[in-house]
């Protein structure tokens, strides 16, 4: 090309300069430049490595260049006509590129740096997740250890309460002593530590039922012996009154009771005007007899409370004893001397006392032979069933067991529980003052709520 033609050739337009500047800015971005360089190197390496692919790519490049040249030649008039609009678009694109560079600083960094930073972020995130997982595992281990310690404390406290309130029986002590004689046998505490929670809980429940049964049976034996003692003294009193009415000197038994002691003391007193006053001794004897009957009445009440939940045959035995005591008490109510008590009443009373003595023996045999029933909770639940309202010293009793007040017992409302039970079974109506018209039959399996620490 000559110098004249070069001088006459038109220079690049303003749009081309702006367009070139925009393209240069985009191409000058480090991330774009590094990425394009990496792609170009990979493209060139692929062409050199595969000759056939290289020939095809060179042919495609030649075609694309021809098409681009022809497209630019045909689009040149249109681009010249739209030069102001394209300049405005270019300016807006430059402004958007400025904002994009501010929001995305990694555009000013090479691709290697961006990849390295991304790897660092991913590694940091993975490390954080691993740390959280380890921390969660550590928390779970600590929680498991805390729950295990809490279970140990609860079981140890329950076992201490059982050992304190229900001591070991003679059979258990003998079995424990026999086990201790064997080789390499640890103590009870060591054996409990090596047992699982469910094994310890099951053995504790079984032992609690057995000890509660033995404890209740022991209480029933005590009441039985006390009732028989009262019946024997009343039998001696009736025999003494019968002999005195017949004019026979009473015979002192081998083990004299209160009545015979009273008459021996009276016989040793000095004479008054050469005779003794029988009326005073008879009055004191009758008063003593009424006291024995009242004491026997309270013992029968305790027996009746203890046999709730047992078969009807056992309850009938206690009811027969109560009827005998009530009949004898009615006969002695207004008597002031022996003559006020009819001989027929004395004879019937002696027979009733003998039958009552036999009934008490049969009652204990029924309890021992029967399978332990809902009364296994022994002296706890029947008291709650019998009382229409909480006892006045309930808080003191609870504090004595657990060592302090506890809000868990704020919901214990015996009248409300009784009314709910009546409404559920549809038996009886409740009068004003929360007093039932008829005493409802207690549930067949009353639940002990006085000592929640022993509820399993």
UniProtKB/Swiss-Prot annotation:
It is found in: Lipid droplet; Cytoplasm; Mitochondrion. GO terms for biological process: lipid droplet organization; lipid storage; mitochondrion localization; negative regulation of fatty acid beta-oxidation; negative regulation of lipase activity; negative regulation of peroxisome proliferator activated receptor signaling pathway; negative regulation of reactive oxygen species metabolic process; negative regulation of triglyceride catabolic process. Residues 1-173 are annotated as: Essential for lipid droplet targeting. Residues 1-108 are annotated as: Interaction with LIPE. SUPFAM superfamilies: Mannose-6-phosphate receptor binding protein 1 (Tip47), C-terminal domain. Phosphorylated by PKA. Phosphorylated on serine in skeletal muscle at rest or upon lipolytic stimulation. GO terms for molecular function: identical protein binding; lipase binding. Gene3D superfamilies: Flagellar protein FliS, Perilipin, alpha-beta domain. Its main location: other. The keyword Mitochondrion applies. It comes from the Eukaryota. Residues 438-456 are annotated as: Recruits mitochondria at the lipid droplet surface. Residues 185-456 are annotated as: Interaction with PNPLA2 and ABHD5. GO terms for cellular component: cytoplasm; cytosol; lipid droplet; mitochondrion. Keywords: Cytoplasm, Lipid droplet, Mitochondrion, Phosphoprotein. Disulfide bonds: none annotated. The keyword Ion transport does not apply. InterPro entries: Perilipin. Belongs to the perilipin family. PANTHER family: PERILIPIN, PERILIPIN-5. This is Perilipin-5. It comes from Bos taurus.
